[in-house]
């Protein structure tokens, strides 16, 4: 997932290209780190073959796509065990072939277009269940716990962040640190299947003790009441037991701006700053124009003791980009 040019060209990572694809009809599955790219890539391929809906399996540009990391790789025989070869054969038969031609891409007038457009609904209704089934098969194979929405943190959390992508690893690290060191009750809902968006599965993932939700979007939609994931969450929770929970909207990481544990702490602490609480905010920058940014209190070192960290400086042809 990479930045779409706006006031300037930027080739680095955010979710503006993904959100721009929302109306295409593609299902969207998100991975947060290199291991998940391996695991959920399998889920995406198998789900699209069975579900007959195209998939975008996305992960953050450069931050995840260019990361060198040790992972557990798949034995292709394990993948073969999960493949529905009857569905593969059906998939191949639907390919364009002069031996059995079909007509696609017709022009339709107002009398029929709307009805035909709605006819695809059963396929999209079925996709979450198909994805969930393949996630369960992957879980059985490799001992993971992939769900459409994964929860991480205190079982009785009072403040929960909803996010997707590589920032989730940073949030998890911050949760571990704050819950252990400061006795907080914080959590994270990690969005995996972004489209189709299953509201009931999101509700299942949120602890019943939740009093505050902060939704983090890695894009900016100028003029909107909120960014896409935030609006999805607000709509999903309406009419549920969380209908009166305060929901804040935050932007982060545009154009690969770094997001640190100290900034995530500021998101959690935002709700406790009664006099300066911001229902709409940014992190990672100092906004001296519209004053939406949250203040961070120094550096938060959440790395395990004994960690060696190195920073490599480079640009372009040396391989760092």
Which residues make up each language-model segment?
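Short acidic, glycine/serine/threonine-rich loops at helix termini
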Residues: 6-13, 39-43, 66-73, 77, ...
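Conserved thiamine diphosphate
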Residues: 10-61, 85, 239-255
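Conformationally flexible catalytic loops at phosphate/diphosphate-handling active centers
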Residues: 55-150
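Terminal amphipathic helices with adjacent charged low-complexity linkers/tails
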Residues: 60-101, 204-242, 248
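Glycine-/acidic-rich phosphate or pyrophosphate-binding loops and their flanking alpha/beta elements
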Residues: 136-159, 293-307
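Redox- and metal-dependent alpha/beta enzyme cores, enriched for Fe-S-associated oxidoreductases
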Residues: 155-182, 197-204
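Peripheral docking tails and interdomain loops at the edges
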Residues: 212-303
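Conserved phosphate/anionic-ligand binding catalytic regions in large, soluble enzymes, centered on
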Residues: 309-321
């Amino acid at each position: 997932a990479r930045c779409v040019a706006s006031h300037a060209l930027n080739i680095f990572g955010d979710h503006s290209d993904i959100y721009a694809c929302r109306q295409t009809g593609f299902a969207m599955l998100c991975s947060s780190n290199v291991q998940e790219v391996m695991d959920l890539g399998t889920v995406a391929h198998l789900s699209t073959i069975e579900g007959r809906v195209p998939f975008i399996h996305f992960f953050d540009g450069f931050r995840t796509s260019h990361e060198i990391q040790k992972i557990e790789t798949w034995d292709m025989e394990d993948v073969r065990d999960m493949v529905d070869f009857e569905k593969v054969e059906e998939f191949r038969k639907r390919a364009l072939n002069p031996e059995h031609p079909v007509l696609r891409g017709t022009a339709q007038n107002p009398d029929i277009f709307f009805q035909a457009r709605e006819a695809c609904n059963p396929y999209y209704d079925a996709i979450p269940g198909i994805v969930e089934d393949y996630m369960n098969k992957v879980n059985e194979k490799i001992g993971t716990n992939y769900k459409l929405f994964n929860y991480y943190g205190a079982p009785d959390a009072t403040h929960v962040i909803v996010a997707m992508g590589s920032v989730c690893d940073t949030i998890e690290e911050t949760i571990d640190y704050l819950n252990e060191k400061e006795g907080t009750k914080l959590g994270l809902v990690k969005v995996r299947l972004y489209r189709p968006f299953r509201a009931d599965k999101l509700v299942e993932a949120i602890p019943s003790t939740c009093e505050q939700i902060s939704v983090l979007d890695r894009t900016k939609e100028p003029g909107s009441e909120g960014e896409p994931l935030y609006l999805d969450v607000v709509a999903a929770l309406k009419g549920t037991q969380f209908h009166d929970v305060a929901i804040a909207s935050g932007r982060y990481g545009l154009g690969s701006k770094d997001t640190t544990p100290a900034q995530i702490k500021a998101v959690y602490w935002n709700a406790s700053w009664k006099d300066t609480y911001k229902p709409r905010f940014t992190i990672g920058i100092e906004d001296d124009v519209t004053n939406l940014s949250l203040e961070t209190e120094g550096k938060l070192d959440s790395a395990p003791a004994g960690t060696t960290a190195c920073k490599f400086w480079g640009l372009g042809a040396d391989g760092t980009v």
